[in-house]
Every structure is written in C-alpha cells, then in structure tokens.
From Swiss-Prot:
Segments traversing the membrane: 19-39, 60-80, 84-104, 123-143, 158-178, 200-220
A Pfam family hit: Ycf1
Recorded family membership: Belongs to the TIC214 family.
Cellular component terms per the entry's GO annotation: chloroplast inner membrane
Protein keywords: Chloroplast, Membrane, Plastid, Plastid inner membrane, Protein transport, Transmembrane, Transmembrane helix, Transport
PANTHER family on file: PROTEIN TIC 214, PROTEIN TIC 214-RELATED
DNA-binding found in the keyword field: no
Region (Disordered): 819-839
Name of the protein this chain belongs to: Protein TIC 214
Subunit-level organization: Part of the Tic complex.
Amino acid sequence: MNTKILLSLPWPKLMDPYMLLGFYYGLLTTLPVGPSQILCVRSFLLGGNLSGLISISGSVLAQLITASSIYCSPIYLLLLRPHLLTIVAIPYTLLFCLVIKDFPNYQILRPVTSLRDSRVARLFLISFFFQILNPIMLPNSVLTRLIYLYFFRYSTNTVFMVSTFMGWLTGQAAFNFFSRLLLSRVKGDSPILYLVAKRFIYATFSIVSISYAVAYLGRAPVSFWTKKFMNESHDREMNLWEIAEYSDLLWWFFKPWPTSFFDPSRANRSNRFVKNRRFHMNNTFYKGRTSTYFFEKCLTDGKERLSFLALPSLSIFGKEMYQSMAKSRRSFGIRLSYQNWVSKKLAKTKFFEKELTDQIKLLDTGSSFSKTMSRKTRLMGGKRRRIPRTYDPFVNNFRIRIPVSQTFLLEDDLGLSLWEWDKLATERKNRKAKKTVRINAIKDKIFTKDRRWKHGYGNPLPWEPLPSRSKRMFYFIFENRALYDYDLQNILKKIKSSPTLDVTWKEIMDLDYEDHILFLTYLEVGCCHRFGWISPLKAFLRKSSKSLSNVERRIRRLNKIGNLSMDLARYTILYFENNFDIPGGDGDFRYRKLRNVGITFAKGKPRSERLMKRYAKVSDFRRKFLKGSMRSRRRKTLLWKALQEKIRSSFFLRSAERTILFQSLIERLTTSSREEKFSELEKDTDYEFQKQLLDISLSAKRSLIGESKLTRSAIAARSDIGPIHNGRGYMLVFQSRFRKFIKLPVLIVLKNIGRILLRQNSEWNKDWTGWKKEIHINCTFDGEDFSQDELPPRWLREGIQIKIVYPFQLKPWHTDGNEKQHTLQRKHKEIGSKSRELKSKRKLKQKKHKFTYLTVLGYQTDIPFGTIQKKTSFWKPVRRKLIRICKRSLPRQIKQAYQFIHSRFEKVSKLNSTPSKKLNLISNLRQGGKLLSDYSLDEKSWMKTSSTNYVNEKTKPNCNVISNSERFIAIGGEMSPANVTRKQLVTRDQVEREFLMSIVAVDSKNLLDEKIDDPYSKITSKDLETGDTTSGDINLVNSTKFERKQLVDSEEAGLSLYLLVRELIETFVSVLINLPFTINRIFVHYFTEFLALYTKLAGILDNINEGSNLSTRSKSLQFDLPSQTCIYIDMWNIGMRGSLNLDLLVNDKRSSSNCGVKNRQSGIYVETDGVSNLYQPKMYEKQTPVHYNLIATKFLSPEIRNNHVNDLTMCFDTETGKTDEEFFDEKVARSIENWGFLNKSCKLDEINWNEWLYSLSRYNLPLTAWRNIAPRKWKVCLSELSSIETNTITELKDQVSQNKLHSYYSIYTKKSFLRNKISNFSKLRKHRNLLQNLTDSVQNGDVENLSVQRDIMEQRFHCKSCIQKSSRGGRNRISKFVHFLSSNVESKNNLNLQIDLLSWLDPDIAKTKIFLKKKKKAKQLKNPLLRNHYRYRYVLDISGRFQKVLNQLNDLTLDEREDADYIFRWKFKFETELEKFRNLISLTRMLGDDQDLITLCTNIEVNSDLLNLQFNAKTKRDMFHNLSVVSAHRLRLVFDDQDLLYKIINPLLKFKGRLRGIFRRRLYRNVYNGSYISNLSHILTERNCKQSCLYNIDDLLSPRRRREFRFLYCLLSPKIEYSQYISRIKKIDNAEKKQTLYHLPRPIRIQKIKRFLWPSHRLEEAACTGRSCVGVMTGSRFVTLRIRMYPIPLN
C-alpha cells in the first residue's frame, strides 16, 4: 500500500528519461567554443563584468532565435540556408578582422561602468551577429544534433523542451561564473600592471580571431547569384487568358484538390556521385548512386512512426497542402474545395456504416455468410470479357518484376476454339510489330541532341559518309603513301574507282592514330568540315545565344530538369552504354583530365564500337561543375590522406588528416618498470639521432616522387610501339592464363597433399575460395578497365594491361581472427620498442592494394609500369614456426631427460632394496595381481591393467552405482558423506554402472583411477582423497630437487647404472607378457560395440520388412488401421498451437494413483512404463537405484511390467500443488469448466470415439485417455507391438554372452542423465505452454474466447482429403469409406470430422512405425526408410505420337504467355492435377473431337468430376475464386535494384516468410491430391450452413472497401461516440447467445469488430487508398502518399 502511495507522488514522475536527456543536450549547446564565446571572454577581460554580461546577453538572444527557428520556418530558412547570408557573412568577417588587427587607443582598454557607454551597443551587436552566423562560420555539431532530435523525436514533448531550456540556462550561468572567475584570477595573479596586461590580451585575441577567420573563410558557401542549372529557363508572369496555350499548366489547373499540390518529378538533390580518382586503393568497378528515398515522420494507426521510404517531393507536397489549409480564412475557394472533399468522404463513411449494419442484420435472420459478403466489381468489355487489372507490386508484396511462370494455366486455354486461336495470334503479331516501331524517350532525347549538335557544329556520326571535298583532301594528303598500308590503299581505291562509293567516318577512325589526326588537322585548318577531335571543348560546348534565344517566348516549368534526372535514373544502363553518350558533351559531369575521345571497334564485330578516352597530365579546370548542391558538400568533407597531395590552399589545412601514433595497452604493460623506461628513453634518443641523419627534406622527397613518375612515363612511352605491343600483349595473355589455370591450381593441390601427409587438416575449400575470388580484367594501355572476358579492340597495335583484382597469395596455413590476435600479442611482447615504432611507421606508409597489374615476366605492380611488388616467401612462416618450436620445446626436453637420468642414479644409490622388490613384479602380474601405482593415473590405464579378473566373472544381480554430487555418495540406497566412504571405495575392486535409458555398462576399475564423463556423477580430487595420489616417477622427479647437491662415488654410479639397465629389461618383459591381454581387451571392447550396432540395424530392417507388407493386407477393411495408429503414436507429441499437453486437465482417478518416484527438482512424477521406455537398452537389472544431485529415480525391470503399454501420467504432489494454485487463476479455471475439458475427457470410451474425435481434435491428451477410448482393434495391434519388443529384447539378451556383460557398449545409450534431463525439461515446457495457451489463447482481434472452436470448424472444408490421404488405400477404398460415413446415421451430423491431419502425417513416423506382423516381399526399394506406401503419383502415360504434338502446343503457349494481358495463376496445392488437366485440353484441341472425352480421361487418369465444374456455372465461378489468383504485369517507374534500402532490408523481412511458405508447400503437396478437386463441388454446397460466428465482421466488406473505411474513419473527429454501434453489436451478441447450433459447443458468440486498424507494415494499403480516396492514379504518386496518407488529427 505504501508503495502505491509512493508511486502516486508527482516527484518520481518528473524524473523522466526525457528530462535527463533534454537537460544533457541543453547543457551541451553551450560547451563548444566558437567566435561568439571567444568574444564574450574577451569582453570580460578587457571591459569588466558589465561588458561581459552585455556580450553574453547578445549571444543568448541569438541562440534563442536559432532555437525558435525550429518552429518558425521563415527564421529557419533565413538562418540555416547559407546562400542567403553569404553576402553578409564574408565581408563582415573580413572587416572585423581588419579592425581588431591593430591596437587603436587606450580607450578600448578602459572598463565599461555604465549602460550609456558607446561600446555597449557595439559589444552586443558583435556577439549577436557572430552567434547568428555561427552555423555558417563555425558549424556547431552538438547544436545540429539537438536540432535533429527536435525534428525527428521530441518536437512535441513538453518535458523535453522544458528540461532542454533548463540545461541551456545552466550552461549559460556556468559560462558566466567561470568567465568572472577567470577575470578575478588574471587580475590577482598578474605579475605586471593589469592595464599593461590588457594590451597583450588584446593582441592574443586578435590573433585567435584572425586565425579562425582565415581557417573558415575557405569553407564559405557558394554566392547567392550562382546559377546551377545552365539550361533552366526563367519564370515570368502572364495573364489568365494565356494559360490555355500551355497544356501542362492547364492540366494542372483542373487537378483534384489534394493532388494539385503534388509534383512527383521534382528532386531536391542529385542522384549520382562519381569518383574523380582513377587509381585508388578502394577503387570499384561500378558507378555509385545515392538513394532517392529519405526518412520522414508519418501517422499510421494513430501513432507517429519514422518511415524510410519518403521521397524528397513529399515534403513539398505536405508543405503546400497544409499552407492551403492554413489560408482557408483568406481564400473562400480553397476552403470550399476542402470542405466539399471532406463532406463527400463523410457521406461515404455513413453509407459504408449503413451497408455493414444491413449485412449484420442479414446474418441475424439466418442468411449464409457467403451470400452476405460483398462481391468484387469488375469492368466488363465486349462479349462479357473482363478487363484485366493492372499488376500492383505493393499489393502482392512483391518489389520486382515477376517473370511469367511456365506452369500456370491461361484462362484462354479453357474455352477457345481453333479459329479464335488464329485470330488471337494475328492480333499479337500486330501488337509486336507496333512495339518494335516505338523508340524509348531517352533515345529520342539523345538523337535530338545529336541532330542539334550536327546542325550547329557538324559533328559527324561514324556511319555517315565523307563529303566530296573531304574525299579530295584525303586523296591529296595520302596519294604518295607506301603500298604496305592496306587501310589507306583501300580508301584510296574507293575514291579513285567511282565517286558513288561512300567512305564513312568509321573507316577514317580505323586508321592509325597519326594518320587520322593528320587528316582531321587539315580539316580543321581548311574549315571544310569542323570536327572536334583536336579540341573537344569547341566541339561539344553549346552556344548560349542559340540555346537561350527563345526563352522568353515559352514557359518552362522548374520540374523539367527533375524529369530528366528521373529518366536518367530509370535508363541508366541504356544511357551509359549508348554510343552517343560522349564525355565532354552536354552531360551531367566531365572528366578532370580528359584530353580527347576516339571511337574504336574490333575487327569482324561491327557492333562493338567503344569510346576510347585519352587523358592529359594536367587537369582541365574548364569543365562544368556537378549539378545540384554537391560543391558545398564536397567542401565540407574531410580531406583524406589519399587526397592531401592536391591541397594548394591554406583554408584546407585544418581538414587535413593527421596520423596519430598511439601506444597500445600491451606496450604499456611491457614498459612498466623503471629500468625498461630508461632503456626506452635511450632507444628513443638513438632513433631520433638516426632519423636526423637519414632525414630527407620535403623538396628532395618531391623530386624523388617526380623522378619516379617521369621514369614510369618514359618506360610507357618507349613501349608504345606497334611491334612491342604485339609481343607484349601475347606474353601478358599467356601469363594471365598460366597463372590462373595452371600455376595456382597446381600449387594449391601440392600444398594440400603435403598437409594431408603431415596429418594436418586440409585447407582446400579456403584456398579454392581465394582462387575463385581472383579476377583478371583486360584493360587498355592506359589502365582503363575494358572487360573480363573479351580483349580490347586493337590491343595488338595499341597495347594492353591485365589487372588482377584480389590477387591470390598462397599461404602454408590460414589463421582465424583469435589466432591472429594471439600472435600479435606475442609479437608485441617479444619485439622491442625500437623495432615496434619502426614497424608502426612502416605500416602507416604502406598501402594494401586490392588490385595489381601483371607484367610480362609474371610479376605484379601496383600501377602500370610501376615498381615490382615484393612477394612474401611461402616457407618463411614455416621456418619461423619451426625455429620458435625448437626454441621453446628443445631445452625443456633436454632438461627433463637430464633430470630423469639423474633421478634414476639417485634412486638406485639410496634404495638398496629396490632390486628385490622389482623382481616380484613378474610374479605379481602372472598371479593376477594389481600393478603398482605408477600406472594408476595414466589416461589409458584400462589397456595397461590386467584383465584376468574379468574374463570368467559374471555380473551380480544387484550392483550399487556410485555417483558423487555435493559431497554425498549413494551406496546401496543410503546417503553418506564422501569422507566416510573413502576407504570403502578404495578397497572396492569392481563397480558396474548400468542405466536403463541411455547409459552403457562401463568397464569396472578403481574409481580413483578414473575420470567419469557424467555431468551428474563427477568425482573430483576435492571430494575423494587417496593415500597415494601421485605416480612414482613424479615423486622421484620432485625428490631430486633436494638431493641434487649430494656427490655420488664411482662405485655407486656403476651400481646404479647396472640396476637401471636391469629394471628396464624387467619392464620390457612385463610389457610383452601383458600385450596379449591388452589386445584381447581392445578386441572385446570393439566387438561388443559392433554387436550392438548390428542388433540395432537388424531391428530397423525387421520393421522395414513389416512396412513393406502393408499393401498385401486384406482389402476388405473399410476403416484402415495404420492411419489411426499413426495418430495414436503422434498424439502425445502434437497439440494445439504447437506443443500443448492437457495432462493437467485429465480427470482420471486411476491414473493419479499410479505415480512414479518423485523428482524434487522439477516436481514431476515419471513412471517409466509408458512410451518413454521405447528407447531402453535390451539388458536390465531388477532394481538399480541411482542417486544424483539428491534426486532418486527408480527403474523397474521388464519382468514386472506386463505386455501392454502402461499408463503414463504426470501428477503433482502436495508440494507442487502449491505452485498449481499460484499459476491457475480463477478465470482460467472458469474457462476450463465452461469449455468442458474435464467432462469431455471423462466421458470418453470406445463407443463415442467419433464424438470425441470431433470435439477434441486439436487437443493433445495423454495415452491413458487414448487407451480408454481406443477401439478393440487398436489394442490388439498395440499388444502385438509390445510382444515384438519383448521378443527383440529377449533375443538380444540371448545373443550377448554373460561373460561379456561388463564390457557391453552401445552407440545409442550414451549419457542417460542428459537424456532424462532433456525429457523432463520438455515436459515442464509443455506444462508451462499449457498455462500460457489457456491464458493467451485469444488471437489478435478476438474479444471472446472462441478462437479454438473457430479453428476447429475451419478444418471442415478439407478434412475429407486429409482422411483419404492418410488411409493409405486406393480410390475404391476411399469411396467406400466416404459411403460408409455418409450412410452412418449416428455420424450424419459429423460428416466432415474436424481432424487436422496435416501435422500428424509425419513422413518419418508414418513410413517406419508399422504395427503389423512380419511379411516379406520379393522386391523392395533401395531405400525403404524413405518409401511412401500410401502416396499415389499419377504419371501421365502418353504414346510417342501424341508427345511431339503436345510439346509443340506447349511451346506455342509459352510464346503466347509472354504477351498475355492477364493470367490465372493456380495455387500451389493443385499443380499436380493442373498438369493433367492441361494435357487433357491440349489433346482435345489436337483431336478436334470431344465425343470420346470420357475414354480419354480414363487413359490419362484425369478425374471426370473436373469436367462437371466446367459445365456448372456456379461451381465454375467458385472454383476460379478459390483455386486461382488473377494477376497482370506493369512496369515500375523506379527499379528496385537502384534502391539501396530495399536491397538491405527486403531480404531480411521476407526470409522468414519464404521459409514458412516452402514448408507449407511441401506439407500440402503430400496431403492434397486429385480427390480434393473432385469433392470441391460437394464442399461448396455444404458451405451454406449457418457459420457466421466463425468469421470476423470486417470480412463482410471487400478488401477495397475495408481500406477506404479505414481511411475515412481517420478523417472523423476522435471524440465521436461509439456507444450507438457498441449497443448494436451487444444486441446481436445477446440474440446469438439464445441460439444453439448443433455443430458447435457452448459458448457461442459473434466476434466484435476490433481489426479495422490494420498493421502499419502493410504499405500497399496506402497505394489503394491513394487511388480510391485521394484521386491519385499514377504509381509514383501513391508511392509517396503511402507515408502520409492520413492527415494529423487536430485536437
């Protein structure tokens, strides 16, 4: 009670995370030191406290204005958009720096004592303006972070706002306090006069201000008058009557109200980003593109959510829409349109409510649910042909274009004649011809540009002919050329022979580079035909006079550039692969060092034209900048080390990357001592001295770099000769193929063979993966990537480079991350500080290239014609590891050998009686005695000890199993401490452990010499102590440490050597004597294991042979037994909602009395006579108590058990009964009584079997209830099963001899304790799931607890097919069984049993566990375990003369499907029957006669009931509704492969659904067959029964109406009273309570509406809402409207 009062107090509620977070971020806004803070401190130090307070007040006011800009858009646009304040910021900063640079006079150093001082206004304005300009001059990262938090998270949270304001005030107060403290300390501690010190303070702050201004001046934004779009026209005013001349504006004027504010083609930023650097360590092969989707808040299901699919134009749409709503007071027209739209939607809402109420009333009168449901409306064309729907990828949960499947059946295949097929074929041919005529819009733009270029400048295309004057000039230039130049001679022959033969520009481009440059130079000088191959800038720049001449005559909208950018994003591949996309033209970007462009092609391939781009050494800075705001972003990015060599301005020095040398934790630990620190200092001084000696000046380094570049250029220039290119190209191609396919595979094979011979794990997969990762790319001579498979054109004349991406390096072994970390730590500990520092600096200088270039001799370079990379030796790590192993292990082994020999000498010299004791060793071994303690602690002592004691010894009937846990040991059923029973355990010679579930008989030995691998019975050295726990050798080695200093005489040394040799001989003889016993023991051990495996396999084969004789069973049975037995076996493991056991709900007094031994940990009684003993081993003892962890479990022998499977019950004792009362609630108990679980389970017997099966089909009862109600035939089969098991156990006991009982071993009986623990845990989990399912059994959307009854009744429509599938019989037997059920009077109302057999038909159980007698069959399958005896596969057997025609028909339909407008996609359950039906239609068309249709159906095994569905209109419509899905195809405007977020998130979201779909598809494929479709007409007629309580009321509406209803309800005010509708539904509930349906148990109620607010992840609903309610019809618009499809309700 006190706790509740304490929680109700207001002060704990104030301590909210929002409050702490707001206070933290408010405090952080004042921490960064910028120009405004520096000026405030300067005012305190120079002008005193009043001056500082005035400066702080100006800064505080500016910060308040900046924070308020979050809620006021004009202030936000004024402050945070740099283009508007650029003109003010830069001049003001320069002026301020120039003013404060020089010291004016001493007036400024006097303190401010009054507010009337002229300096007050100046100080206030300076601090104010610098704080306002702070986001531009010095971007505050913390303030920016706070702004984003306001926007996206806490903008409406009052607690957060107040706490932020308090934190901000605290920060300002702290800043004021510390500034005053600094002033007092400077005044008090100044060694000189404070007035003189002010001069130094003034100079210091002037230097700081100037450095800030200079450093951030280079980051100033682009000026306001910058023109970013060169070809963008200017808007101008016009009259209203001129609008009719422009169709686009006129169309926009008459748009509906919400969509008139939306412009889908307007983009806020660019869509592409291209890297400038060609040779880079992280170079990629594809151009990267930024995503077009951004984050935005949305309102879904009444909650604000953050969506990642918002387009940039969404913000424009929302802004304009809300502005129009806000201006409703001023504009009557806008307010009227908005009110009209809302009133229409509210009227539609009332109509929907009335329609839903009428449908509910129809259900009350007794109408069927199928007739009451709303029907879908479709548009119909001529001859009642339905117009297909457009394919909507969002509605069907697909984001990609779906190819047409080859197994789906077209609607046209069902009823078209031959002449209709011919007509359809001609129509499709005409349609294809029209499609070929169409040209893409982007191609039109490119060709128009090209024609405009051609008319303006005369740039020819490659296939255009040369003009006559150009031909004459060509003939004049190359008339006297040598005859061996065949290309020139061919062109000259064409010009000489006849003037009609055309010479194209392509032939000119095929000439040598010098020839066509010479020809084009003459053309440029002679002004005959201007062509821009010498100066691309003149050729491709557009004249501004012509392009802007007609600007004022026409109006261009701003979204034209946006349209072009969207088209480019859509046709990126087409645009960049086109031959006319010439770099340097009017495109989006231009290369930095582009010199000229040429067109090349491969011989014999006229379509392989490629643009060859050649680059200059100096960048072309006349190129056009990127469109958009990329320049400002590029200016604010950090300049990485790879780009620092290009820095030429002091403004960028602050952004340069600086290397940070840090010392790791391991290095600190290794240099912790004082001596090591002094040594480190000495080494550092030596290193600095050497560095000064070897230091090279910066100019010298630059000269060296320049010389290396010049050297590479010289080598490339000398190699740029035709014959050299020829030989070099062939050598490079040979080296590439040799390395990839011969050298590396051979080395990998040899390495793995060597590892296998050295007994190491093979690394074939890792090496082969690295080999596959290596890619060879053919490049041009200048290093530009061309292709991976094809060689570049003219590679023998112009040269080639081969680029190796991810080069493979063979290593002796592959190390994991952990091993690498350990090796690095070892290296850090071993290597000194000097080498460590040198290595770190060397690593910083090195760049790990992901690609290299191949040389002629097979070496690799980082760049073309660069320095050869040094290859790491393969044997170097091997040599290092061998040296390391030798250094570590060899001295230790030598020392141990020396100590061992020395201890032997000492032992012999001290113990003179040793020979007499050692001679008794052989006699003790022959008499069967024990070995000495030297062998007691060996790991393989069971091989070294003598086994003569166990050869003829029989096992005792009652053996005590000893286990230790918590210092207690159980002996003979009594618990005693470990120290009391120590002596008794030591003297015990033999202990045999035998557990009946999974423990094997273990070799008897001394427990002190054994480590038991059992989690519950571990005997450690702490619990049990022995008198002699160490070996003799260890004692002797330890004793030599104290006796090493004693001298040994020569006689004693000789005697000790003699005794040592004698002892070694005796040891060798004893080993030879023990060798036969050891071999015999090993043989017996493995023989018993093989015997256990053989008996287990024999039992499995016998069960399989029984299953093979199932089909020979008598066919007279109408109710087949194996299906019921499968249900009987699997019922224990399967329950409602996955795994639910109703053991606690069984009201059976007989079962409660037969409880087993108590398990104190889990509170469960387990009697092991039930099904859980199916996996027991075949040898038992009468009574074997086992004690572990203070738990006693008792196992009974099979002699006590009867031949039947006894009851297996689980009950709770008095102690656990208390926990039951805690878990069981009164509501749960009342629900159990209302549902009637206890009564129904008590009334079950053999007579009312069908009634029980009908009522409790989804529940999982124990075997006691099953045995009470099972038929007599089941019990007979069950007794046969138990007798078979008993016979198997006795046969196995006879086969195993009693003398080998102690060494019995089985691979199936390991760790019984672990198995028992898992089984008990599963039982506890099932009981816990029981309570959870009883309390949480209501599904999402249910109000009454009727989900279980509804799920039972939903199985009515497919139970026939399930039972027919599980009966394992033919069609005759199925029909007889159905006839038997229909003729039975008692089960007339239960015609369709509610049995969900889908999960019970487990193939592994249904195929192996057969409870029949053994009958052998002559012919069996290869794998009987996977054979299905009851599944029928209908294979179509068609003769060869029909097969060829059938294939032709299938090929024809595949071609027709590609152009199909819409198709009927059959569900996956009916694909098997669909294929037969399809073949029937194809053969009917081929024969052209339908008279002999029944015979044809019989031959191809097609059910004749399918034909009835064709002629029955009602069933045909229902069949198409239930078995097919209508779909059509529509192209997307934005491809999914261009959406980065989609590629990241979509596979994760759909992975679980795909797995679930695959599992469900496999399950239904085994259960459903052709009989389901044959009984479809019967099922459809039986659905007319009154089952309205099984459905949700919102299912009465169509999906489209439901989506509209949801949207319209969001428009209503949240204060609407729903009492009227709730009262109506309650009246309906009361009326339904009075009815009593014969097929449902009580209670019976109709579910209430609770699922109108659908889940927020259904994004496709927004698309439908946008189309139907808002009037948006195009795809791009509903993509954006799905984020903000509901307006925010106004409170």
